[in-house]
Curated annotation (Swiss-Prot):
HAMAP family: MenD. Catalyzes the thiamine diphosphate-dependent decarboxylation of 2-oxoglutarate and the subsequent addition of the resulting succinic semialdehyde-thiamine pyrophosphate anion to isochorismate to yield 2-succinyl-5-enolpyruvyl-6-hydroxy-3-cyclohexene-1-carboxylate (SEPHCHC). It comes from the Bacteria. InterPro entries: MenaQ_synth_MenD (IPR004433), MenD_middle (IPR032264), THDP-binding (IPR029061), Thiamin_PyroP_enz_TPP-bd_dom (IPR012001), TPP_enzyme_TPP-bd (IPR011766). It is an enzyme of class 2 (transferase). Its cofactor is Mg(2+); Mn(2+); thiamine diphosphate. The gene is menD. It comes from Escherichia coli (strain ATCC 8739 / DSM 1576 / NBRC 3972 / NCIMB 8545 / WDCM 00012 / Crooks). One of its GO terms (molecular function) is 2-succinyl-5-enolpyruvyl-6-hydroxy-3-cyclohexene-1-carboxylic-acid synthase activity. Pathway: Quinol/quinone metabolism; 1,4-dihydroxy-2-naphthoate biosynthesis; 1,4-dihydroxy-2-naphthoate from chorismate: step 2/7; Quinol/quinone metabolism; menaquinone biosynthesis. It holds the Pfam family TPP_enzyme_M_2. It catalyses: isochorismate + 2-oxoglutarate + H(+) = 5-enolpyruvoyl-6-hydroxy-2-succinyl-cyclohex-3-ene-1-carboxylate + CO2. This is 2-succinyl-5-enolpyruvyl-6-hydroxy-3-cyclohexene-1-carboxylate synthase.
Length: 556
């Protein structure tokens, strides 16, 4: 019997089972113990293969692919700390609803806890974060193939969001020529190999039904809060709210067109919050709200009913309102709950939103990150997409810009970490094939610098803007101790990215004014390559501009 040959047949069943659940993208890191899985993936023509040498970046690459494709994406890594590097992407997927499959190779049981090299306790290492965890036995013909494939099917059939961890121990030898070992074991699955359906088909989960009293509530004074959703859903939500005559507070990730722009500015005005107190119902569509003032209002509002609609399970309401948690696809829910044409009931808020935007426009000429956030719409590629980093940049865009309705926007706003942002952007571009504008801060770029290797392989123009304000200037907005702020919070690195771009053979620009920035964009959108645009700005200007605008708008 050939151990290496049967390892590969066992792995081939696992990989083929994944294809029955929509897996097309598979991300592979180098490793020896994962050889059976890697070779099985390489031999399966259903997969699009992606490789990366850094497992943490690999996880975020898969996350980006899953964001766009809306399908589960698989990863293959070797044993040891390579597995632990997938943790951040797994956590993010659990919070934002992407589907990830972690295929982690492992040493066999007799090599665990005995000093063997690269052998750690992998089963259960991700605690409660996976939706489902499977610790497979060592490959053996004593276990029928139908058990293996149905085990995979059960885990993936019940996967609606988050990750599945499949731990796969393999004994040596891992290499060798294929022979007939295990062929009859594999063939007992019969015509499943020619079919395209799972061996075990799980019934779909139940979703929230139509709210029978909707006809009553739609006649009341309501507010629509739009969180993270798809571009198509964003356009539908905007029309739905407009028909109802309800004010729509749109997050940067809502893709609604934010008809009442600069919400995180005007929500700091007492006239706006006073008017919103008249709302009898708040319907929040989508989660992951960004703006600080929006979150403060959301926490303090007390309507008669607060409904949250999202297809991700869980409460999704840190304010713990009395109301309804409705698990449903947003577009489907809107169809079940049609709007009734009514006149807008808010008078003060549209005026404040217009005045807030005019205050922002009055400051747009200076060359800084707040102004870039406002101008970002001017630089979006046609038929393209936007990827927004975390920390200060996403808050500035949320507060100061007005993104077009239905324009795809992606971000990692689940756990909101700055790790893996460039890798995620790479996955977003690969899955869509669209021109992509990505914008991150300097610390975020440093954190994931080796992901520039992934950005060498793009199918359409990708522009990465690195806003270099020399540190974590988000902490300038927080009451951090002045005496310790720079050393322990901002942590300025005093670096530039020209040589990093050159190392990975990426185009690079460092504009000094808006005209040079526009010229750099015009050049970048012409060719299907990656261009790094480093925008060096005064360190505290962005945070100070936001604070000044907040003070100005609060007194309108």
């Amino acid at each position: 019997m050939s151990v290496s040959a049967f390892n590969r047949r066992w792995a081939a069943v696992i990989l083929e089972a994944l294809t029955r659940h929509g897996v097309r993208h598979i991300c592979i890191a180098p490793g020896s113990r994962s050889t059976p899985l890697t070779l099985a993936a390489a031999e399966n023509s259903a997969f699009i293969h992606h490789t990366h040498f850094d497992e943490r970046g690999l996880g975020h690459l898969a996350l980006g692919l899953a964001k766009v494709s809306k399908q589960p994406v698989a990863m293959i890594v070797t044993s040891g700390t390579a597995v632990a590097n997938l943790y951040p992407a797994l956590i993010e997927a659990g919070l934002t609803g992407e589907k990830l499959i972690l295929l982690t190779a492992d040493r066999p049981p007799e090599l665990i806890d005995c000093g063997a090299n690269q052998a750690i306790r992998q089963p259960g290492m991700f605690a409660s974060h996976p939706t489902h965890s499977i610790s497979l036995p060592r490959p053996t013909q004593d276990i029928p193939a139908r058990w293996l494939v149905s085990t995979i099917d059960h885990a993936l059939g019940t996967l609606h969001a988050g990750g599945v961890h499949i731990n796969c121990p393999f004994a040596e030898p891992l290499y060798g020529e294929m022979d007939d070992t295990g062929l009859s074991w594999q063939q007992r699955l019969g015509d499943w190999w020619q079919d395209d359906k799972p061996w075990l088909r799980e019934a779909p989960r139940l979703e929230s039904e139509k709210q029978r009293d909707w006809f009553f509530w739609r006649q009341k004074r309501g507010v629509v809060v739009a969180g993270r959703m798809s571009a198509e859903e964003g356009k539908k939500v905007a029309l739905w709210a407009q028909t109802l005559g309800w004010p729509l507070i749109g997050d940067v990730l809502s893709q609604t067109g934010q008809p009442l722009p600069c919400a995180d500015l005007w929500l700091g005005n007492a006239k706006a919050t006073s008017e919103l107190q008249q709302a009898q119902i708040v319907v929040q569509l989508g989660s992951s709200l960004t703006g600080k003032r929006l979150l403060q209002w959301q926490a303090s509002c007390e309507p008669e009913e607060y409904w949250i609609v999202d297809d991700i399970e869980g409460r999704l309401d840190p304010a713990h309102h009395r109301g309804r948690r409705l698990i449903a696809n947003i577009a489907d829910w809107l169809e079940l709950h049609p709007a009734e044409k009514r006149q807008p009931w808010c008078v003060e808020i549209p005026r404040l939103a217009e005045q807030a935007m005019q205050a922002v426009i009055a400051r747009r000429d200076a060359f800084g990150e707040a102004q870039l956030a406002h101008r970002i719409c001017d630089y979006l590629p046609e038929q393209g997409q936007l990827f927004v980093g975390n920390s200060l940049v996403v808050r500035l865009i949320d507060a100061l810009s007005q993104l077009p309705a239905g324009y795809p926007v992606y971000s990692n706003r689940g756990a909101s970490g700055i790790d893996g942002l460039l890798s995620t952007a790479a996955g977003v571009q690969r899955a869509s094939g669209k021109p992509t504008l990505a914008i991150v801060g300097d610390l975020s770029a440093l954190y994931d610098l080796n992901a520039l290797a992934l950005l060498r392989q793009v199918s359409a123009p990708l522009v990465l803007i690195v806003v270099n304000n020399n540190g974590g200037q988000i902490f300038s907005l927080l009451p951090t101790p002045q005496s310790e702020r720079e050393r322990f919070y901002l942590m300025p690195q005093n670096v530039h990215f020209e040589h990093a771009a050159a190392m990975f053979e990426l185009k690079y620009h460092r504009p000094q004014n808006w005209q040079e920035l526009e010229t750099a964009f015009a050049d970048a959108w012409r060719t299907p390559t990656t261009t790094v645009i480093e925008m060096v700005v005064n360190d505290t200007d962005g945070a100070q501009t936001l604070q000044q605008l907040l003070a100005q708008v609060s007194h309108l």
